[in-house]
Every structure is written in C-alpha cells, then in structure tokens.
C-alpha cells in the first residue's frame, strides 16, 4: 500500500513539474509574440503594430532614403530621386535592385502594394492624403515636415526601424565632423554667408531654417545684416522669394553660394539664372567682385535634404574655405 502511495506521489509531482514547465514556456512564447511589434508615435498619431525588425521597407522621401542607407538598411522600394534615372548619382551603387515606386509627390500605391512591405515610411507634407491607403498595405510611419532639419526625421526613422542607437550614432558622427570643421575654420566663421537658388520665374534666399541654413548655423557662420532685417518681416525663417532683380543687393555677403534647380524645366531655370547672374546688380555684389561667389550643386545644397547630402555640403565648405586658400 505504501508503495502505491509513494508511486502516486511521484506521479503527481511529475505532472506538476511538467505543468510548470509548460506554463513557463507558454509565458515565454507570449513575451516573444508581444515583442514582435512595437509602438511608434509619429505625425499621423500612434501606431502599435510596427514590426520589431522590419525586413521589407518602402520609403517615400528622398531624405528618408538617405536616412535608411545611413542606418545600414536597403529599402525594397523608394520614390525616385528628384534628379537622376532613377537615383542621384551618389546613391546609384547603394540603390541597385531597389524598386522605383514613383515620385515623392505622387507615389504609385499599386507598385508599393506589389512589394508586400512590412513597413512604409513617408511624410505628412507629401503624402497625408493617401496615408490610409498606405496604412492598409502595411504599418505606415510619417514624419511631420520637410522644413530642413533632417536630424529630427532621421531620429524618427531610426526609432521606427528599431535602430534608435544607430540613429544617434549617425547624428553624433555628423555633429563631430561639424565640430572638427568649425575648429579648422577658426575666425573664418565670422564671415557672412548667403545662399541663393534660381528657378524659372523665382529667385530665393535661403535662411536659417532651411537645409543649408541649419548646417551653416551649426558651423557658426553669420548672415548679412540686410538678410537679418529682411527676415524679421517674415513669419518663417526658411526662404525669401522674389521675381525682382531689385532684390539682388539683399543677396550679397562675404561669401555667396548659389545654385539652379535642374530636376525639372532645367533649360528655363538656367535661362532665368543667367539673366540674374549677368545683370550689373549681380556683378557689383561684393562676393562676386572678390571672387567669393561660388556655384554649387542644387541637389546637395537643397533638393536631396538628407544625411548624405549634408556631408557633401560640408565637403563644399571645406573646399571653398580651406582648400582653395
């Protein structure tokens, strides 16, 4: 009898141990399952279904493409570069095999769906009207703006793809490069700098909240007093647009960088630029007469708007302030 009771006790203990193991395993599986998605706050609200480790990402802005590449991620699909067939020259090698899904202003929703993405990254300014369509295809995260501060957007994208630490590293590396360059520039940062862009029918002065403006400000450059006064009259500190050559004197500075938009209507834009740069007002600018008016690449200085372009812009600063002296 005692033998039977002993055997029964052993059996019950074994059942309890197995039950505990199964319960533990079930709990463990539940934790793994719950960790397969993440919650991300973005311009369109809060998404709680973002894959923990997305593998098939479609990106719908040029600056977003550069951000993903900097994070070590190659998207399966991306919108076409503003200039290039279909990518900017400096992105061609990195973007081999990536599907072109249309323009930033008009993504091809069907092409995106065919790629079966597990995450879509876009921008409220560009694609707010089709957010619901995109979100029905895959979890979709939107940045708020394209004003010029690419660091904010890169931080959001890094969080969305679960690479927040890598995002911080990318930004820290850029900031260190800026700091090192600022030290090399020394008192040259006391010079005033102006940034001008030509488009057909419109000429622009880019100020402190623009893509080049933010970088120049980080380097410590000043703006000419005329522009300081000009932008006091504006609500934004992004750009001043004009079609009157009488505004050319406002473009002057110790150093002037100018460029022409060539992604669309290139001939008309170049014709407009030539009309301005051949005028007597332009030729009489201090920067022009001193040989400190430099024509630079529109893609790098404003069109692309991403981390790679930002580094190329720093290359230009090194060239014109250090290497040509």
From Swiss-Prot:
Induction per the UniProt record: Induced by iron starvation, repressed by fur.
Organism superkingdom: Bacteria
Positions where lipid (N-palmitoyl cysteine) attaches: 21
Keyword Ion transport part of the UniProt annotation: yes
Membrane-related topology note: Lipid-anchor
Predominant location: membrane
Domain Fe/B12 periplasmic-binding: 56-325
Modified residues (Phosphoserine): 290
Residues spanning the signal sequence: 1-20
Positions where Phosphothreonine occurs in the chain: 302
InterPro entries tied to this protein: ABC_transptr_periplasmic_BD (IPR002491), Bact_iron-sidero_bind (IPR051313)
Family: Belongs to the bacterial solute-binding protein 8 family.
Subunit-level organization: The complex is composed of one ATP-binding protein (YusV), two transmembrane proteins (YfiZ and YfhA) and a solute-binding protein (YfiY). Interacts with FloT.
Protein name: Probable siderophore-binding lipoprotein YfiY
Gene that this sequence comes from: yfiY
């Amino acid at each position: 009898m005692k033998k039977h009771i002993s055997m029964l006790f052993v059996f019950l203990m074994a059942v309890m141990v197995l039950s505990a193991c199964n319960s533990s395993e079930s709990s463990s599986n539940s934790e793994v399952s719950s960790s397969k998605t993440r919650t991300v706050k973005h311009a369109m609200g809060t998404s709680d279904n973002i894959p923990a480790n997305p593998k098939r990402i479609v990106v719908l802005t040029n600056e977003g493409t550069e951000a993903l590449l900097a994070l070590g991620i190659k998207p399966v699909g991306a919108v076409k570069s503003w200039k290039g067939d279909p990518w900017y020259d400096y992105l061609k090698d990195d973007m081999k095999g990536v599907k072109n899904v249309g323009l930033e202003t008009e993504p091809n929703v069907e092409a995106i769906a065919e790629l079966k993405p597990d995450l879509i990254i876009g921008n409220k300014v560009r694609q707010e009207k089709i957010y619901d369509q995109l979100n029905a295809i895959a979890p979709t995260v939107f940045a708020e703006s394209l004003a010029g501060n690419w660091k904010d957007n890169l931080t959001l994208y890094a969080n969305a793809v679960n690479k927040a630490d890598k995002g911080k590293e990318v930004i820290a590396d850029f900031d260190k490069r800026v700091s090192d360059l600022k030290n090399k520039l020394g008192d040259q940062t006391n010079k005033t700098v102006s940034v001008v862009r030509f488009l057909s029918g419109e000429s622009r002065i880019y100020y402190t909240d623009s893509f080049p403006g933010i970088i120049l400000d980080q380097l410590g450059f000043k703006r000419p007093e005329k522009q300081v006064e000009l932008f006091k009259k504006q609500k934004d500190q992004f750009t001043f647009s004009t079609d009157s050559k009488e505004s050319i004197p406002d473009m002057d500075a110790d150093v002037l960088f100018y460029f022409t938009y060539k992604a669309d209507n290139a001939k008309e834009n170049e014709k407009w630029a030539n009309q301005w740069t051949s005028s007597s007002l332009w030729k009489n600018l201090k920067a022009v007469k001193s040989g400190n008016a430099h024509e630079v690449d529109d893609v790098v200085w404003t069109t692309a708007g991403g981390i790679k372009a930002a580094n190329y812009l720093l290359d230009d600063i090194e060239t014109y302030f250090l290497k040509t002296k």
